[in-house]
Protein backbone atom coordinates (compact mmCIF):
# COMPACT_ATOMS: atom_id res chain seq x y z
CA UNK A 1 0.00 0.00 0.00
CA UNK A 2 2.91 2.42 0.59
CA UNK A 3 3.36 2.82 -3.17
CA UNK A 4 -0.27 3.98 -3.33
CA UNK A 5 0.21 6.74 -0.73
CA UNK A 6 2.15 9.25 -2.79
CA UNK A 7 2.08 12.97 -3.51
CA UNK A 8 -1.52 12.66 -4.70
CA UNK A 9 -2.58 10.54 -1.72
CA UNK A 10 -5.29 7.91 -1.81
CA UNK A 11 -8.93 8.04 -0.83
CA UNK A 12 -9.53 7.31 2.84
CA UNK A 13 -11.85 4.39 2.15
CA UNK A 14 -9.18 2.67 0.04
CA UNK A 15 -6.55 3.39 2.71
CA UNK A 16 -8.69 1.72 5.38
CA UNK A 17 -9.45 -1.22 3.11
CA UNK A 18 -5.80 -1.71 2.16
CA UNK A 19 -4.83 -1.48 5.83
CA UNK A 20 -7.15 -4.40 6.55
CA UNK A 21 -9.55 -2.40 8.72
CA UNK A 22 -12.72 -2.92 6.70
CA UNK A 23 -14.11 -2.95 3.17
CA UNK A 24 -14.44 0.31 1.21
CA UNK A 25 -18.22 0.31 1.66
CA UNK A 26 -17.86 -0.26 5.39
CA UNK A 27 -15.26 2.53 5.50
CA UNK A 28 -17.71 4.93 3.86
CA UNK A 29 -20.27 4.08 6.56
CA UNK A 30 -17.72 4.55 9.37
CA UNK A 31 -16.60 7.86 7.86
CA UNK A 32 -20.21 9.08 7.72
CA UNK A 33 -20.63 8.00 11.37
CA UNK A 34 -17.58 10.08 12.37
CA UNK A 35 -15.46 7.10 13.46
CA UNK A 36 -12.51 7.97 11.20
CA UNK A 37 -10.12 10.86 11.79
CA UNK A 38 -7.32 12.24 9.63
CA UNK A 39 -4.79 14.40 11.45
CA UNK A 40 -7.19 14.83 14.37
CA UNK A 41 -10.14 15.99 12.26
CA UNK A 42 -13.17 13.96 11.21
CA UNK A 43 -12.67 12.44 7.77
CA UNK A 44 -15.18 13.21 5.05
CA UNK A 45 -16.20 10.92 2.22
CA UNK A 46 -13.56 11.32 -0.48
CA UNK A 47 -10.88 12.67 1.88
CA UNK A 48 -7.34 11.79 0.85
CA UNK A 49 -4.56 10.26 2.94
CA UNK A 50 -0.92 11.25 2.38
CA UNK A 51 2.37 9.76 3.60
CA UNK A 52 2.49 12.10 6.59
CA UNK A 53 -1.21 11.73 7.50
CA UNK A 54 -2.18 10.34 10.90
CA UNK A 55 -5.31 8.21 10.56
CA UNK A 56 -7.34 6.84 13.45
CA UNK A 57 -10.32 4.49 13.43
CA UNK A 58 -12.48 4.40 16.56
CA UNK A 59 -9.64 6.18 18.36
CA UNK A 60 -6.94 3.69 17.37
CA UNK A 61 -4.11 4.55 14.95
CA UNK A 62 -4.21 2.95 11.53
CA UNK A 63 -0.92 2.48 9.74
CA UNK A 64 0.15 1.11 6.45
CA UNK A 65 -0.67 -2.57 6.47
CA UNK A 66 1.93 -5.04 7.59
CA UNK A 67 2.62 -8.26 5.76
CA UNK A 68 0.29 -9.20 2.99
CA UNK A 69 -1.54 -12.47 3.47
CA UNK A 70 -2.66 -14.93 0.79
CA UNK A 71 -4.27 -18.15 1.95
CA UNK A 72 -5.21 -21.11 -0.26
CA UNK A 73 -8.03 -22.88 1.57
CA UNK A 74 -9.84 -26.12 0.72
CA UNK A 75 -13.36 -25.02 1.64
CA UNK A 76 -15.56 -27.84 2.92
CA UNK A 77 -19.28 -28.12 2.17
CA UNK A 78 -21.47 -26.13 4.53
CA UNK A 79 -19.21 -23.07 4.83
CA UNK A 80 -20.47 -19.80 3.31
CA UNK A 81 -18.02 -17.53 1.45
CA UNK A 82 -19.04 -14.35 3.25
CA UNK A 83 -17.43 -11.96 5.69
CA UNK A 84 -20.82 -11.36 7.34
CA UNK A 85 -20.38 -12.46 10.96
CA UNK A 86 -24.17 -12.75 11.33
CA UNK A 87 -23.99 -15.91 9.21
CA UNK A 88 -22.98 -18.67 11.64
CA UNK A 89 -21.29 -20.66 8.86
CA UNK A 90 -19.17 -17.80 7.47
CA UNK A 91 -15.70 -18.62 6.16
CA UNK A 92 -13.95 -15.90 8.19
CA UNK A 93 -15.05 -17.28 11.57
CA UNK A 94 -14.36 -20.83 10.37
CA UNK A 95 -10.74 -20.02 9.49
CA UNK A 96 -10.30 -17.70 12.51
CA UNK A 97 -7.19 -15.99 11.11
CA UNK A 98 -5.72 -13.24 13.35
CA UNK A 99 -5.64 -10.60 10.56
CA UNK A 100 -8.68 -9.32 8.65
CA UNK A 101 -8.93 -11.33 5.41
CA UNK A 102 -11.65 -11.77 2.83
CA UNK A 103 -12.37 -14.35 0.14
CA UNK A 104 -11.43 -13.77 -3.48
CA UNK A 105 -14.63 -14.77 -5.23
CA UNK A 106 -16.90 -17.38 -3.76
CA UNK A 107 -17.99 -20.98 -3.77
CA UNK A 108 -21.58 -22.00 -3.04
CA UNK A 109 -22.37 -23.31 0.43
CA UNK A 110 -22.86 -26.83 -0.93
CA UNK A 111 -19.60 -26.69 -2.91
CA UNK A 112 -16.15 -27.66 -1.76
CA UNK A 113 -12.79 -26.76 -3.21
CA UNK A 114 -10.01 -24.22 -3.44
CA UNK A 115 -10.71 -20.63 -2.52
CA UNK A 116 -8.16 -17.89 -1.95
CA UNK A 117 -8.40 -15.40 0.91
CA UNK A 118 -6.28 -12.28 1.35
CA UNK A 119 -5.88 -8.93 3.04
CA UNK A 120 -4.50 -7.39 -0.17
CA UNK A 121 -7.04 -5.57 -2.33
CA UNK A 122 -4.66 -5.40 -5.30
CA UNK A 123 -4.64 -9.21 -5.52
CA UNK A 124 -8.44 -9.26 -5.49
CA UNK A 125 -8.61 -6.67 -8.26
CA UNK A 126 -6.04 -8.52 -10.36
CA UNK A 127 -7.98 -11.77 -10.15
CA UNK A 128 -11.62 -10.69 -10.25
CA UNK A 129 -11.78 -7.63 -12.50
CA UNK A 130 -13.11 -8.45 -15.96
CA UNK A 131 -10.65 -6.11 -17.68
CA UNK A 132 -7.89 -8.65 -16.96
CA UNK A 133 -9.79 -11.28 -18.99
CA UNK A 134 -8.93 -14.32 -16.85
CA UNK A 135 -10.33 -17.62 -18.01
CA UNK A 136 -12.24 -19.56 -15.38
CA UNK A 137 -12.42 -23.33 -15.40
CA UNK A 138 -14.71 -25.46 -13.29
CA UNK A 139 -14.58 -29.21 -12.74
CA UNK A 140 -18.01 -30.55 -11.88
CA UNK A 141 -18.98 -34.01 -10.69
CA UNK A 142 -22.63 -34.98 -11.09
CA UNK A 143 -24.53 -37.76 -9.39
CA UNK A 144 -26.47 -38.93 -12.47
CA UNK A 145 -26.15 -39.10 -16.24
CA UNK A 146 -26.70 -35.88 -18.17
CA UNK A 147 -29.21 -36.49 -20.97
CA UNK A 148 -29.56 -33.05 -22.57
Residue ranges and their predicted role:
Residues 2-148:
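Basic, flexible Lys/Arg- and Gly-enriched helix-loop patches that mediate nucleic-acid binding at interfaces
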Amino acid sequence: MDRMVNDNGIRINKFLSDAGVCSRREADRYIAEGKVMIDGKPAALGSRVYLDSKVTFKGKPVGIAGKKVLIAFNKPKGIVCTTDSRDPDNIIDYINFPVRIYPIGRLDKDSEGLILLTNDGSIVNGILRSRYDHEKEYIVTVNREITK
